[in-house]
């Protein structure tokens, strides 16, 4: 008979197939809470996919609403703008709640139980990602705090990744990809973003021949995202001066 942990993992997979990601999160939170053992690679990937989909839907909604708000403001439609702001704040409350949920799990359990280099980097990168998602819409002191926490988590992950993971390792590449996006989109540092992306790409290219078959697809997919972002960023830097909301970076490797 399956243990409660195995049952919840199975239910999380079912929820993923049914695209019921909120329930997938609930099942994986039960797995995390079930014991003090480190999650398996399959379990941590399921947790990541669950949260990525739940947060991804709201991030997309927020971007759409913010774009409409900007257009209505430029037209002087004050009544519409007031309605949009109220609606946007509802989405922001959901985003905050989701981010706080996974950040609590990471700090209280997951980072502390991580025993290997790749799992430590995986969870610290995840911590950086969810603080970055907060920094996307927070303002003032809250945005500053979220950005500082993002930078701290990504730097901690980078230190471990550079010492313990190969330049072609998908988790190390994914970290560099998202770290570069943070520099570009949150810190408004296109030069640092491009330098980080180019360095990670070049280091991986130099060792491409050592890639095992199992990680070749993941690693080369992320390397393509580096290329896409660098193309987008360099064209944005040349076109600077427009007030439009820029196309979001292609970043954030797919789990």
Swiss-Prot record:
Q: Per UniProt, what is one Pfam family of this protein?
A: 14-3-3
User: Which InterPro entries does this entry report, sorted A to Z?
Assistant: 14-3-3, 14-3-3_CS, 14-3-3_dom_sf, 14-3-3_domain
- GO terms, biological process: protein localization; signal transduction
User: Single GO cellular component annotation?
Assistant: cytoplasm
Matching PANTHER family:
14-3-3 PROTEIN
Q: Which family does it belong to?
A: Belongs to the 14-3-3 family.
Question: What's the protein here called?
Answer: 14-3-3-like protein A
